[in-house]
Swiss-Prot record:
Lineage: Bacteria, Pseudomonadati, Pseudomonadota, Gammaproteobacteria, Pasteurellales
Name of this chain's protein: tRNA U34 carboxymethyltransferase
A molecular function (GO) term: methyltransferase activity
Methyltransferase listed as a keyword: no
Function comment: Catalyzes carboxymethyl transfer from carboxy-S-adenosyl-L-methionine (Cx-SAM) to 5-hydroxyuridine (ho5U) to form 5-carboxymethoxyuridine (cmo5U) at position 34 in tRNAs.
Domain of life: Bacteria
Species annotation: Haemophilus ducreyi (strain 35000HP / ATCC 700724)
InterPro entries xrefs: CmoB (IPR010017), Mo5U34_MeTrfas-like (IPR027555), SAM-dependent_MTases_sf (IPR029063)
Amino acid sequence: MIDFRPFYQQIATSHLSAWLETLPLQLKQWEKTAHSDYAKWAKIATSMPTSPTSINLTDKVEAVLAEALPEGEKQYLIYRLKQLMPWRKGPYHLHGVHIDTEWRSDFKWQRVLPHLAPLKDRTILDVGCGNGYHMWRMVGEDAQMVVGIDPTELFLCQFEAVRQLLGNDRRANLIPLGLEQMQPLAAFDTVFSMGVLYHRKSPLDHLSQLKAQLVKGGELVLETLIIDGDINDILTPADRYAKMKNVYFIPSVAALINWLKKIGFKNARCVDQSVTTLAEQRKTEWLENESLVDFLDPTDQRKTIEGLPAPKRAVILANA
């Protein structure tokens, strides 16, 4: 199993120390109900080699060895990493292995990063962090501490495998809880919520919970699906959206900024809009499932398979 005690020690003397009132018990309860494959995945993750010669988190997530692994060892590493499929967020370059993930998450980071308040020395929360790709990029920007939350057991084990291959780097930590399970800490300088809002049945509650984690004046980075339209336009799919069951509300940018104002955020502004392309989300050998090409109308890629507007995403910044 994955040991969270080093994280408890890290935050014990920090302004996150109040979290220790609830977190250890929550994680004990989480382990009791974890996925039946969690122990197997965790064993794979925690047995990864931990001695890279150097790491690069500035323009990619990379761990380099002075000498290439012998081919047999490299193939065994690939075999073990593929036991943790599907790999959705990345890519990773680890000990000579290129994990070519479904999403080119570096594309999103290139869209987001230029607009952010500098992350250097900040304490950061990444909500719905997946396997933690963007957390490592935040570390690469000299963040003081990055905490990701995502309740998915496989993502936790992918994150721990990457952490090991990066030399057991402790500047980022993934906690397998949902945002609604966190006590309001008001302790993070920057809070990210990327690709989460449209999965929430109550988006305003989600925004309020994000605000409760920020220090006064802290920065929210909200990246989500949007539609074209004015302040009154919000898409509520009748059934599925791009084959996803759990998509509830997709607002226009104007509607989304209005939501943020209602929650009490200040200086809400849209800094980027982009249509999701087949270059950014696609099937690879590290993902056996369907991907974006299967979710779009084969005769008109401006629409989803259900006839709704194809995925378009916006980055919104606001301050608590």
